[in-house]
């Protein structure tokens, strides 16, 4: 049986440009979720579409080091670096959770040069909802 002829420069093999479209975003929302185990920073546009995100785990911190303030600072810096290149100048910050990385992430956001219109704490508070887990005995 004859071998099929390979076409050089066929459409399948070539890639035209990048899939991610780069758009200018003047204003956005920075969501910081700080738990005791990890800190996740998500940057969205005003409509809520995710532009960039980072967490302490993706920055290379593993285990208990993910919950540290330094890990949160690094995660916030990584998430914001991408959106500053896309032209973001103003942002709102929404912080959720009781973790140690709350203040460190906010400090890193302030240092990035983005003007903050407001900082809001959106930590969910139960009105006597579910029973909390038992206290630790160490």
Curated annotation (Swiss-Prot):
UniProt GO cellular component terms: chloroplast; ribonucleoprotein complex; ribosome
Lyase keyword on record: no
Keywords carried by this UniProt record: Chloroplast, Plastid, Ribonucleoprotein, Ribosomal protein, RNA-binding, rRNA-binding
Pfam families, alphabetized: Ribosomal_S11
GO MF entry, a single one: rRNA binding
Region (Disordered): 1-23
UniProt-annotated location(s): Plastid, Chloroplast
Claim: Chloroplast is one of the keywords in the record: yes
Ranges annotated as biased composition (Basic residues): 9-23
Entries under InterPro entries matching the protein: Ribosomal_uS11, Ribosomal_uS11_bac-type, Ribosomal_uS11_CS, Ribosomal_uS11_sf
Family of the protein in this entry: Belongs to the universal ribosomal protein uS11 family.
Classification via HAMAP family: Ribosomal_uS11
NCBIfam families: PRK05309.1, uS11_bact
Protein name: Small ribosomal subunit protein uS11c
């Amino acid at each position: 049986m004859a071998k099929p002829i390979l076409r050089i420069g066929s459409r399948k093999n070539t890639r035209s440009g990048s899939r991610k479209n780069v758009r200018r975003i003047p204003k956005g929302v920075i969501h910081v979720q700080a738990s005791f185990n990890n800190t996740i920073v998500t940057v969205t546009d005003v409509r809520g579409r995710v532009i960039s995100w980072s967490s302490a785990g993706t920055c290379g911190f593993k285990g208990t080091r993910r919950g540290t303030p330094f890990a949160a600072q690094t995660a916030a810096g990584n998430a914001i670096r991408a959106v500053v290149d896309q032209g973001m100048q103003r942002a709102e910050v929404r912080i959720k959770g009781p973790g140690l990385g709350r203040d460190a992430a906010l400090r890193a956001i302030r240092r990035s040069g983005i003007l903050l219109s407001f900082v809001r704490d959106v930590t969910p508070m139960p009105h006597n909802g579910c029973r909390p887990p038992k206290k630790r005995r160490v």
